[in-house]
């Protein structure tokens, strides 16, 4: 930001000097300096973008690695169709959680990729109350109606959610006990998340704090 402002100020001063009648080598040197500063600014912006992109890729790789590891430890059956992902507080928006990376192992985003209110669903409940939450929806129950009546979703939002029968949300804390986000798991089966698996997932997701903090 400092470089950008400096470039603008120098460029304006150069134009003023040139318009005031300066010419020859002196004016050319000033103009050349402004061009050099502009090019330097573009270069640093490009470097900053590349570093930021690389860091983002690295973070996503690490998060996926953690989810993959705990997933494998639980030995879920293929029929359970378990998915795992992470939601973290959106920068500058305390009331919004954003999905960090795609679901593992399906490699797809949820319908709330652009943001989920902390007031909705078990993910929001887990984040607000800073405690783990497991929910099982019986087959005979209406999944869509349940989301609307119990979790604050609109009908349109509920229609966009893929039908699942069991959900597990685990809060992710930093070293000071502040909740940073939520590790989320769901399944098409009712009894997928046994106490043993919940314990494995809870302990296994602790390292996520390093990558979303």
Predicted regions and their residues:
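Intrinsically disordered, low-complexity terminal regulatory regions
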Residues: 27-105, 110-113
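Amphipathic secondary-structure elements and adjacent low-complexity, charged linkers
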Residues: 64-76, 92-95, 122, 128, ...
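Juxtamembrane interface helix immediately N-terminal to a transmembrane segment
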Residues: 1-17
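Juxtadomain coupling helices with adjacent low-complexity linkers
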Residues: 179-213
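Long, hydrophobic/aromatic-enriched structural stretches that serve as scaffold segments
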Residues: 1, 22, 39-43
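A short, aliphatic-rich beta-strand micro-motif
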Residues: 156, 165-174
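Regulatory sensory and allosteric helical modules in signal-transduction proteins
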Residues: 98-162
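Juxtamembrane "helix-exit" motif on the non-cytosolic side of transmembrane helices
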Residues: 19-29
